[in-house]
Amino acid sequence: MLRAIAEERGRLSLRREVCGLGCFKDDRIVFWTWMFSTYFMEKLAPRQDDMLFYVRRKRAYTGSESTADGRKAEAEPEVEVEVYRRDSKKLPGLGDPDIDWEESVCLNLILQKLDYMVTCAVCTRADGGDIHIHRKKSQQVFASPSKHPMDSKGEESKMSYPNIFFMIDSFEEVFSDMTVGEGEMVCVELVASDKTNMFQGVIFQGSIRYEALKKVYDNRVSVAARMAQKMSFGFYKYNNMEFVRMKGPQGKGHAEMAVSRVSTGDTSPYGTEDSSPASPMHERVTSFSTPPTPERNNRPAFFSPSLKRKVPRNRIAEMKKSHSANDSEEFFREDDGGADLHNATNLRSRSLSGTGRSLVGSWLKLSRADGNFLLYAHLTYVTLPLHRILTDILEVRQKPILMT
């Protein structure tokens, strides 16, 4: 199946060079409907879900709006992911013109035909550039076109397609022993493989140093939380977990880490967070690879049968692009000083609101402890655009590094 898709993508590139974008459209529809019927409707693998995913693309109504030059404004297509059981009588017909059959094949391939293993490791880099792994943990994860907040329970899933999420709901238990200290870094690697384990390739790699995590953590320490702790005579219990989003190399997806301070038995309010809106922090997220022994957990439920989201036209065009194979090679290079501040790290916090922060901000800097302390670094999820996963699977096929 992977070979057939790769060959079709190659033929498409050749056809575009010969006769332009509009050539062989009907031929391509025949190919993708045949692929969908053959590999998902007729062939049922032993571990394959009894579900089919369809990407429906419609034109939204624009009314009488027009552009500055007088032309009629084109409507942004509305994308809807529909989910049906294989034996449902409501399955869309193979000739349905509103179904994007190519994307439907690719989505079902990523969700059902591949296995995924994520590895989180605490490492150090030697002077020669080699990576030394001190401890690591691997966990099987599942691809989903939907997401839900990791800092709250019971919230309904929302559509994320074309971004695919690999979530670890029990991240605090799975990565309970992942602590990072001075001079160390946290490395994340996500690997895809087929059901027979004949194919294996890295689809995400990233790393972040302890110093960057600690800087984020320190900058989120909440003066308001400290004051509330004192004024409530200890009855106020703060939550000291921060969610740090790490961008992948060259913007290739991102991973989220739940960061908290390892308790030392000190009950003082040092180490609480600033719960003000996320302040911009920057850390270069470099690349690399993934997994040893998997631990299976139950596959999560997928979301509602019909999920809608408008996708800009330029995003659709972007999904069709091929991407270079060197997205992950920066992990092997030495950090270049000031360049470490180029990738923004977005933060989310589930701490107390920062009331009075502006009044006592300078006092915070004076009273903050300068010493280093251990941090928990729990991986919560990895997310990647569908087209980047396809490119890594079909073209790049980078070998894992963390897997031994």
Curated annotation (Swiss-Prot):
InterPro entries: DUF2045
Keyword annotations of the record: Phosphoprotein
Domain of life according to the entry: Eukaryota
Record carries keyword Phosphoprotein: yes
Composition bias type Polar residues, residue spans: 262-278
Biased composition (Basic and acidic residues): 320-336
In-chain residues carrying the UniProt-annotated modification Phosphothreonine: 290, 293
Modified residues (Phosphoserine): 268, 276, 279, 304, 306, 324, 358, 362
Region (Disordered): 262-307, 320-340
Phosphoprotein among keywords: yes
PANTHER family registered for this protein in UniProt: KIAA0930, ZGC:172139
Protein name: Uncharacterized protein KIAA0930 homolog
Native organism: Rattus norvegicus (Rat)
